From Swiss-Prot:
Substrate binds at L70, E71, L72, M89, E90. GO terms for molecular function: preQ1 synthase activity. It comes from the Bacteria. It comes from Elusimicrobium minutum (strain Pei191). Its EC number is 1.7.1.13. The active site is at C48, D55. Catalyzes the NADPH-dependent reduction of 7-cyano-7-deazaguanine (preQ0) to 7-aminomethyl-7-deazaguanine (preQ1). It is found in: Cytoplasm. InterPro entries: GTP-CH-I_C/QueF, NADPH_dep_7-cyano-7-deazaG_red, QueF, QueF_type1. Belongs to the GTP cyclohydrolase I family. QueF type 1 subfamily. The lineage of its organism: Bacteria, Pseudomonadati, Elusimicrobiota, Elusimicrobia, Elusimicrobiales. This is NADPH-dependent 7-cyano-7-deazaguanine reductase.
Length: 132
């Protein structure tokens, strides 16, 4: 292991993870059977909490609804709040998943953040939830 200190702190790591964001609204699912819903935001942006530089990527939300479906306009406003937020990519995928699960309580959900390469490294973060 290298002894190089890259200057990351616990504050950097936690930044944005507990941010208060607009509520994601839902509407009543009309079907009892399982079916898949995929929502993509191809122009997602946020800010690196350490460098202040913008991060770009594609956020994909896949879920199997239970009683509720996500309302897209409120979801869009929710996702736009990340634009000026300092938050690590790993926290983005996990926070979105937590907030989606809290809002609509799906049977299953996966949030994928596919971020534009930075320094030659591409990051794809996949956060998963399955109702027990």
């Amino acid at each position: 292991m290298s002894d190089i200190d890259f200057g990351y702190t616990k504050d950097h790591a936690r930044k944005g993870a507990n941010a208060k964001l607009p509520e994601i609204q839902c509407w009543e699912n009309q079907y009892k059977r399982d079916y898949d819903i995929r929502i993509e935001l191809p122009e997602f942006t946020s800010v690196c909490p350490k460098t202040g530089l913008p991060d770009f990527g594609v956020i994909t939300i896949d879920y199997i609804p239970d009683r509720l479906c996500l309302e897209l306009k409120s979801l869009k406003y929710y996702l736009l709040e990340y634009r000026d937020m300092g938050i690590f990519m790993e926290n983005i995928a996990n926070k979105i998943l937590d907030d989606v699960v809290k809002a609509c309580k799906p049977k299953k959900a996966v949030v994928t953040g596919d971020f534009t390469p930075r320094g030659g490294l591409r990051s794809v973060i996949v956060a998963k939830y399955e109702k027990k």
